[in-house]
A protein has these predicted regions:
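Short, low-complexity N-terminal intrinsically disordered segments enriched in polar/charged residues
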Residues: 1-54, 58-66
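A beta-strand edge to alpha-helix "cap/lid" segment located at domain peripheries
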Residues: 2-29, 98-169
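Intrinsically disordered, low-complexity regions enriched in Ser/Pro/Gly/Gln/His and often acidic
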Residues: 7-8, 43, 85, 89, ...
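Charge-dense, low-complexity intrinsically disordered segments
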Residues: 31, 35, 80-83, 136
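Generic ordered-secondary-structure signal
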Residues: 35, 41-44, 72, 96, ...
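A solvent-exposed, acidic/Ser-Thr-rich amphipathic alpha-helical stretch
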Residues: 58-127
Length: 169
């Protein structure tokens, strides 16, 4: 996106067309350590979704860098709030989640590590967001998430997330 406030229009492949995704053919890990790291990277992505859905802010702060950066948009609608620290994301979620009367679930699929070094990783995933109440289960939105991770003191953490939602919810 050309600026923080620009929003690409909805169309098939809008994330790729507007340079928000960069999925490439999978690469073989360079050795056993990178292969094990790749498994952990997948789990960190899943833990991020769990931490949001279950309001596990202690987990969230353990898997995000302090200077974590969150950006995103709803295609053709609006940018999402730009959040620039892990503590600010926790504060934002603590204010927003109680306004909902449902249980959100982020289901990730098609997770692919597109770039990996010994200390950094670029990861893409699809997310299906659902809402559950005692009466119904409702699909809310689909999205792509792009994660940039760094390995700090031997621990993989998310440094940045871009969430590209296909529709408002």
């Amino acid at each position: 996106m050309s600026s923080e406030t620009s929003v690409p229009p909805f169309s098939g492949g809008w994330g790729h067309t507007h340079g928000l995704t960069d999925v490439r053919p999978p690469r073989m890990p360079l050795g056993l350590e990178q292969a094990v790291d790749r498994l952990v990277i997948h789990e960190v992505v899943a833990a991020y979704c769990w931490s949001v859905d279950e309001a596990q802010y202690d987990l969230m702060t353990q898997i995000l860098t302090e200077d974590f950066d969150f950006q995103g948009c709803i295609a053709g609608v609006a940018p999402l709030d730009h959040i620039t620290r892990a503590a600010d994301l926790v504060t934002w979620l603590q204010a927003w989640l109680p306004t909902r009367c449902d249980q959100l679930r982020h289901s990730t699929s098609n997770v692919i590590v597109t770039e990996q070094t010994d200390t950094t990783a670029d990861v893409h995933a699809y997310v299906t967001l659902t809402s559950a109440t005692p009466e119904a289960l409702t699909p809310l939105a689909t999205a792509f998430y792009r994660f940039w991770l760094v390995k700090q003191d031997g621990t993989w953490r998310i440094a940045k997330v871009f969430s590209g939602f296909d529709r408002a919810f």
